[in-house]
Amino acid sequence: MATIVVKQIGSPIRRPEIQRKTLIGLGLNKMHRTRELEDTPSVRGMINKIPHLVEIVEERG
């Protein structure tokens, strides 16, 4: 299956609780950390909820 590399570019400080939980759901918790995730509709939806906090670095597959 295809994967995407996601990088956290924004801080969760002073953000709504739902945005912080979305970051945790993606496996991110500190600035400039990256995660390689499966490219599924649920992951894409989570990324689309917080585009100001994360960026897609690379799409593989």
UniProtKB/Swiss-Prot annotation:
Gene Ontology MF terms: structural constituent of ribosome
Disulfide bonds, paired cysteine numbers: none
One cellular component term from this protein's GO annotations in UniProt: cytosolic large ribosomal subunit
A Pfam family of this chain: Ribosomal_L30
InterPro entries reported in the protein's UniProt record: Ribo_uL30_ferredoxin-like_sf, Ribosomal_uL30_bac-type, Ribosomal_uL30_ferredoxin-like
NCBIfam families cross-referenced by the UniProt entry: rpmD_bact
HAMAP family cross-referenced by the UniProt entry: Ribosomal_uL30_B
Protein name: Large ribosomal subunit protein uL30
Gene from which this protein is expressed: rpmD
